Amino acid sequence: MLSGEIFRADWDSRETSWDFARPPYLRGGHSLLQDAFDDWYRRSCETAEEAQRLETENNRYWADVYGLADKVEVDVPLSRVSLTYNPRFAFAPTKGASERAEEEYRWLHFQRSARELISWAIGVTMGRYSVDVPGLVLADQASSLDDFRARVAESRLQPDDDGIIPVTGGAFDDDASRRVKAVLRVVFGVSDLGDNIEFLTRCLAVKSGSTTAEFVPPVIPADPEQALEDYMAKSFAADHQKDYSGRPVYWSLESPKGTFRALIYLHRYTPDTVGQVLTKYAAPFVDRLKAESEAVGRERDAVMGGDR
């Protein structure tokens, strides 16, 4: 593969590329997410090394042409091969910091892949993507489910009916964490769903080492389901905004104190969307919280009354 082709393929592996087809770690038909991420990390490293070889050869050729072979550095460090998915470029230590261990590069690569997988899963839920066809599906203003069905005749996973995904810790059937699990179930299968959720949330828990502390691999969260819900509630919107350079396609609507959240899709937004968020999700959620609070109050009163 030529250097230009390598860099083009690297760019198109990003969801923000117009030519993005599907996540690169979905190749190979793996049923375990860890195997898929391992394979993607290996391919990313091999691609970076090939690009390094080609760039070094190019430098050497031009140095020879201009008689500068003894005067300029022709070897290209792997950390300067500017591929998005080159771990040693993407996660290069800051100036003056010690070199990262191979295991740290690997886990940082896994963490980014986990965040990207969740973003893609939300896209599948919204109809932006499909598990059955590559590339963008619904990406025009006021796109509808009819538009989706025209593009994807037989879909293993239908988009959300209203393009609104509540982020409430499982209070609704179409809650964000449940939707992510539904995509994992379809893509990787039912039998390994538990293992895949454990590994996914383990990747999300990666904490990079510092100049004063060695890297410690993440452990499986005590409650992987809760860890996924926490990520969706606390981190997903910020990660998405960063990945899309401040121009997100999934908008987060939140109550003043952040108790209620919902995601809506830019290209499925209609004049009725905000009203639907309020009537179908926010109001029932508030009623549920109120009922739970009243139930706790009654239990407390019963306990206190029994102690008299």
Q: Predicted segment positions?
A:
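Terminal accessory regions of large proteins
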Residues: S17, E50, N59-A63, G67, ...
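Extended amphipathic alpha-helical segments enriched in small hydrophobics
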Residues: M1-W62, K290-E294, E299-D301, D307
